[in-house]
């Protein structure tokens, strides 16, 4: 599992993911669950104007571009990957009640999810191939 973060900074996610992929290949490990963010690729359509133009457009643009590069590395890795795209992290308890795999046309998500629920979903996907080579969004 890969859940690397660096706040607003760029470069950390892609570089860390590159190292994880290399280590997995060297060890013969094939299953990778990688946490990215809602808004990458086709999930851009799930975002509201605040996230599209203010947050990812201005304030955390380097982090956004880092996620784009990270996802490219995962897709090209040759591993059995799933890229999880959670909405904005919030503090909160594990609820086990969240939406996942919604289409890019869904515009009724809350655009937030607890870290505990993100971890729950990622752990479940280690043994579930429903989202193998897919990029499910994750939100309340």
Regions found by a protein language model. Give the residues of each.
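Short-chain dehydrogenase/reductase
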Residues: 10-14, 48-49, 59-69, 108-116
């Amino acid at each position: 599992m890969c859940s690397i973060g660096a706040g607003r900074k760029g470069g950390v996610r892609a570089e860390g993911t590159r190292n994880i992929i290399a280590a997995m290949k060297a060890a013969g490990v094939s299953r990778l669950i990688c946490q990215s963010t809602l808004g990458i690729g086709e999930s851009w359509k799930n975002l509201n104007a605040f996230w599209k133009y203010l947050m990812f457009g201005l304030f955390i643009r380097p982090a956004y571009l880092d996620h784009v590069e990270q996802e490219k590395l995962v897709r090209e890795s040759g591993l059995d990957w799933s890229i999880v795209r959670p909405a904005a992290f919030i503090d909160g308890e594990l609820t086990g009640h969240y939406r996942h795999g919604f289409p890019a046309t869904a515009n009724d998500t809350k655009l937030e999810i607890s870290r505990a629920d993100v971890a729950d979903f990622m752990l479940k996907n280690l043994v579930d191939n429903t989202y193998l080579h897919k990029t499910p969004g994750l939100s309340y």
